Amino acid sequence: MNPEANENSAFVAGPKWFPVDNDGIFQLADIDYVATYKAMEELLQTGKVRAIGVSNFSIRRLEHLLKQTEVVPAVNQVEAHPYLTQPDLLQYCQGKDIFIQAYSPLGNNQTGEPRTVDDPLVHQVAQRLGMDPGVVLGSWGVQRGTIVLPKSVTPSRIAGNLQVRELPEDAFAQLNSLERHKRYNFPSRWGHDIFDEVGEETAKKMGKEAGPENKTKFTV
């Protein structure tokens, strides 16, 4: 089997941001991400951009990319928080001088599940240190060598995000212990195994099962 089969999936071009068929199944196109990245490399030569990077790349996909391109990505933007530490990916990227940008550093509530920032242990650590729970998680992310990307539109929260500081070793270790490989952002409804975790056949099945909900949720 070709390990790169079904590797290059993207939404088909069209007027809709989220193209689904009559059954609610996402319509994917075969787009070569290596070719796309090479085009981004050419942009560097124009001076119009200063750096290029990738998002949601596994170690396997990074290795495939690096073998065929010249410029090492400046960043790999992935979901990361104490519930999803991805230590192997972090170590690999650090060894290649690729920064990890952590999105959803507090977890999110898109699925209605409790967020990482709401974990009782996070609040215990925050109370003991006299810190906001969100700032605690931001501090944890910076301390482990990642670029943390918290989202906020509130001026006070934006200012608070700048109050990160080094955590005591025991507090840092406590937060590390929360690891459970929990993803809040898992696009299984797309029908593509983007994270190399469930297999393409399972991902396609999950995409079909999500079809009825997709038809009502993704209308633009």
Regions found by a protein language model. Give the residues of each.
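Beta/alpha (TIM)-barrel catalytic core signal, keyed to glycine-rich beta->alpha loops juxtaposed to Asp/Glu
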Residues: N2-V220
